[in-house]
């Protein structure tokens, strides 16, 4: 296989004031996956040596996967005074993810109709059998099948959360996240048996609650509850 993964990231943090900071970032990820020529050939024992297995047993396969993935984020952090460890803060921000996927697989099934025996595997070349003359003479048949799909995914998220340390033992975190999900899939697979398009456009509101109680310097108890999809 011929595969390629490229990851590019840029992250920054700006201190706007003593209490207010901005976290921002962006990334572009690219995936390329190619299977240029996978071959499957089945040979069986015969009376005079070997022969190509009859039926739809020989195959050539090509596939290509391309994915572009863009991620962005920006968030404000406002630090609160809690007179304990000063870890209390309020966060507001946005994240976005935009993905384009495409996949195409081409499969050639070669059905052997006539095949002569060959005494040894040494020096045997399949190109001597799979050629235009033998195809025209009906020694084998070719069936072509193409499976493909494309996916477009856009997710916009806005969030707000607050963390406050009431005492040296108690820390509370409350949050609310809003996701707008827009996904579209176009597909034609299973030899045309499954063809169509599906779309998801939905809003999600996702609250969360986290409690932490410090028993001592080394041990603590945590309780978390959240909604996901």
What are these regions (language model features)?
Residues 19-22, 34:
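Alpha-helical solenoid repeat scaffolds used for protein-protein interaction
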Residues 2-19, 26-28, 63-73, 79-134, ...:
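Structural signature of Gram-negative outer-membrane beta-barrels, strongest in the C-terminal barrel
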């Amino acid at each position: 296989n011929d595969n390629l993964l490229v990851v590019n990231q840029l992250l920054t943090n700006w201190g706007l004031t003593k209490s207010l900071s901005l976290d921002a970032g962006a990334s572009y990820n690219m995936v390329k996956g190619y299977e240029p020529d996978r071959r499957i050939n089945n040979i069986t024992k015969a009376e005079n040596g070997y022969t190509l297995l009859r039926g739809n047993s020989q195959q050539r396969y090509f596939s290509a996967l391309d994915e572009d993935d863009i991620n962005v984020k920006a968030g404000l952090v406002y630090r609160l005074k809690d007179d304990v460890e000063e870890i209390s803060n309020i966060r507001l921000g946005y994240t976005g993810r935009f993905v384009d996927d495409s996949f195409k697989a081409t499969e050639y099934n070669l059905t052997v109709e006539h095949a002569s025996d060959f005494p040894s595997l040494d020096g045997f070349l399949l190109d001597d059998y799979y050629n235009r003359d033998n195809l025209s003479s009906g020694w084998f048949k070719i069936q072509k099948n193409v499976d493909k799909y494309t996916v477009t995914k856009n997710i916009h998220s806005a969030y707000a959360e607050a963390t406050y340390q009431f005492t040296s033992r108690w820390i509370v975190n409350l949050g609310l996240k809003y996701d707008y999900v827009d996904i579209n899939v176009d597909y034609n697979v299973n030899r045309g048996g499954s063809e169509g398009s599906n779309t998801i456009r939905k809003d999600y509101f996702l609250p969360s609650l986290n409690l932490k109680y410090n028993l001592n310097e080394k041990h603590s108890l945590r309780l978390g509850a959240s909604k996901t999809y």
